[in-house]
Amino acid sequence: ALYVCGDRYWFAAPQQGVDAAAAGVETAEMTDPSGQSVTVRRGDIRDLSDLAYFPSLTVVSVQFQSLTSLESLPACGVEVFDVSANRLTSLSGIEQLPKLTALTADGNAVTDLTGLGRCLNVRKLSLNGANVSDLSELRALTKLQDITLSHCTRRELLIPLHKSSLTRVTLVDCDLRGDFFHSFDRERAITSLTLIRCELDSTSGLEDFTGLTELTVRGVSGSLDWSALGSLPLQTVTADALQADAIAASGTTATVKVAD
């Protein structure tokens, strides 16, 4: 495994990488493998062709670099790939990683998923910061279990939400108005749902999420009826002041954590 974050690198995983919001800055905080807080400067990696010289690498993280494209990726056996906080707008080139199982590209203003549909083994996908209106590349990803998306509408999300393989869903800055909880194909399979700064106008259908054990709701305004939570097997609910009181009043037996 190789972990590059800004101008530093390790062969063990950092405890916490840079924040996705670091895309527009030149220095950022992260936590190294030993637990030390470190300030890193943006790295100058712009090309990934050297990965061809490391055929045995299966885990590669190149966070907080100067990548504007993945077109330089060589065909290789990387399975876990993290390109968070770079300057990417397209995933074109990602198809060179046919064994890819997990892709994290948070903090990139990605608008184009071209090539991702050829990575048929992807189980985990995180695109917090992306603004993609065409999610058709996700149709072929029949093994997708864990997805994070941002700046989508409920209608645009129908392709991933209709996947029967999904178990974990995180949505950030999405417009979910219009019967969101009825938009899933197999809501019973969802174990974790996180909604951050999303627009939501109804909780109708929430009672069908009978496998849900973890719920996070932050930055979601409006008067919403959370009474369905009382019948779900939830273990933990995290909410901010906007919804915490209404959730606590739902009768849920879950531990309700109030976030800032």
Predicted segments with their positions:
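Extracellular interaction modules
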Residues: G251
